[in-house]
Amino acid sequence: MSFNPGNNQNSGFSFGKPAQPNSAAQGAATPAATGLFGNTNNNTSSTAPSGGLFGSNNASNTSAPSTFSFGKAATTGNSTNASTSSPFSFGSTNTNNTAGAKPLFGGLGSTGSANSTGDKSKNTASSATGAATTNPSGSTFNFGSSNNSFNFGKPASTTNTTTPAAASTGSLFGKPAATGTTSNAPPASSTSTTPATGSGGFSFGKPASLGSTNNASTSTTANSGFSFGKPATTSAPGSNTTVTPSSSITGTNDSKPAASNTGSAPTTGFSFGKPAGQAASTATDKGTTTTSSAGTGFSFGKPATTEDTNKPTAPNSAFTKPATSTGDNKPTFSFGNTSKPTENTSTTATSAPPLSNNTKPAEGANQTSSGFSFGKPATDTTTSTSKTGPLFGNKPADPSAKPGATASTTPSEPPPSSIKHKTLQEILNKWSTDLTTQTEVFNKLCDQVSDWDRTLVDNGALISKLYTETVEAEQMSNRIDDGLEYVSSSQQELFKLLDSYETQLETFDGRATSALNVERERAFGVADDILSRLDRLGEDLGTVINQMNDFSKPDDSISEIVKVLNAQLASLGWVENRIFQMEEKLDTIKKKNSDVLF
């Protein structure tokens, strides 16, 4: 699909434009129009061109530019002068340059893999004429394509390529170095110029990618950002690749490139039921042997994964932090991750030379973690790291790199999950039962707190009453204190008066007694004597009277007779009074009768 109808060679804006096969002799040049981002330059010289501003690559003699594209397919050639460029692309596949420079801001997902063979008997016509043979890959965004960056149901990719190593310079803003492949295959070996690069950003059910079985060089990279049920990727035994070391901005790297045995490295970001991907890595001072690595970001029931990666880090840029090469195996969310064996991870990271004294060097790490998992087993990690030379000048030899130098750590196994192998209904029932129990406990605690609150309120009332009584007692105590102070002041005044009287009596004692005082004293004596005598006379008179009364009481019956007669006289007087009353009543009755008759 293109928004520029007309010439097919110049597409201003394209989504998933397929590659145009180029088959031109060496020295033929085709002009290309420039676009807004990523101008394609035509160079006829044999030197390596410099990087473009926004991911532009220089083409030598033969170019098929796509100025602004999403997922332009790869163009593969056997000639060193045939190249294609994808200035600005999302998920662009391989662009093969033997001496291609890196763009300024770094291409997105592009991997160089120029193919050349050493078979003299089977490649005579191609080497004699110098023609460039291209095998374009599929579009970047496609459904069911063979080579794509975003596809559904990608078929298997079987590659057998041989690529010489190409020196490359580091980009300005942290693009990783391009990776080329070389081979030391004998002349009689089978040859193929088809690149094996499959970048799947979003894939459903991508089958396995199989490498070659011969000793030919193989470079297979399968990157899948989102996959459902992606099978394992099996690397070819005996494949041989060469990784071009990354150089700094101003310095060059004259050391020998590390020869590595590289298989496939599929990486998935989101997977359901992904099978195991096995890998093994060995870091030495001159070579690195690496097989596949697999990582998932979100998985349900992911099986075991054994990962080994060999990722050279990107060189330090001028304005950004040095690249960090990580290989993560993270089943972020997993239910029932059963029978997962121990994961062995080995990482060989090559840090770029530092740009300045305060810049942080590149870090290589391969971690296996679980964000949300039930019953994840233990994970074993093995890491080996080698470092490059300084920023400016040639890279010195690293004497510390020793084969087999690894550091392993074994974390403790997490406790088993209590809800593993349980259905959702069982979990909900358990939670409901726990909620009911906790509710009952909470209600009991609420009742207890209510009782405590009621007790506190009652005690508060008692404390208020006690405080009132205390205030009253303090007021009464203050009044008593005032009274005591008044009494003490009165007592002080009385003491003063007594002191004055005592002083006056002392003055009176000194005076002489007169004759009147003597007479008074005598009169007081006589009066006392008279009073005592009168008392004795009164006692004597009482005794005489008592004796006279005793003698004046004779024993005769006359007094008794007088008493009886007096009683009878009183009775007769009462009877007489009653007679008078009856007579008066009869008289009144008679008067009434007489009044009635007359």
Swiss-Prot record:
Question: What superkingdom heads the lineage?
Answer: Eukaryota
Knockout consequences: Abnormal spore germination; spores fail to divide with defective septum.
> Is Transmembrane given among the entry's keywords?
no
From the record, give the transmembrane residue ranges: none
Q: How does it sit in the membrane?
A: Peripheral membrane protein
Cellular component annotations (GO), alphabetically ordered: nuclear envelope; nuclear membrane; nuclear periphery; nuclear pore; nuclear pore central transport channel; nuclear pore nuclear basket
Kindly list the biological process annotations in GO that this record carries.
mRNA transport; protein import into nucleus; ribosomal subunit export from nucleus; RNA export from nucleus
Mainly localized where?
nucleus
The terms under GO molecular function for this entry are:
phospholipid binding; structural constituent of nuclear pore
Extent of Polar residues compositional bias: 1-13, 87-99, 232-270, 311-336
What compartments host this protein? Nucleus, Nuclear pore complex; Nucleus membrane
Task: Give all Phosphoserine modified positions.
Answer: S489, S490
For the region Disordered, give the residue spans.
Answer: 1-140, 154-420
Keywords of the record, alphabetical order, are: Membrane, mRNA transport, Nuclear pore complex, Nucleus, Phosphoprotein, Protein transport, Translocation, Transport
- Compositional bias, Low complexity, is annotated for 24-86, 123-140, 154-169, 176-197, 208-229, 279-302, 337-357, 379-388
Complex and partners = Component of the nuclear pore complex (NPC). NPC constitutes the exclusive means of nucleocytoplasmic transport. NPCs allow the passive diffusion of ions and small molecules and the active, nuclear transport receptor-mediated bidirectional transport of macromolecules such as proteins, RNAs, ribonucleoparticles (RNPs), and ribosomal subunits across the nuclear envelope. Due to its 8-fold rotational symmetry, all subunits are present with 8 copies or multiples thereof.
Free-text function comment from the UniProt entry: Functions as a component of the nuclear pore complex (NPC). NPC components, collectively referred to as nucleoporins (NUPs), can play the role of both NPC structural components and of docking or interaction partners for transiently associated nuclear transport factors. Active directional transport is assured by both, a Phe-Gly (FG) repeat affinity gradient for these transport factors across the NPC and a transport cofactor concentration gradient across the nuclear envelope.
Domain notes for this protein:
Contains X-F-X-F-G repeats.
Q: Which family does it belong to?
A: Belongs to the nucleoporin NSP1/NUP62 family.
Which named protein is this? Nucleoporin nsp1
Organism of origin is: Schizosaccharomyces pombe (strain 972 / ATCC 24843)
Q: What is the organism lineage in this UniProt record?
A: Eukaryota, Fungi, Dikarya, Ascomycota, Taphrinomycotina
Q: Could you tell me the gene encoding this protein?
A: nsp1
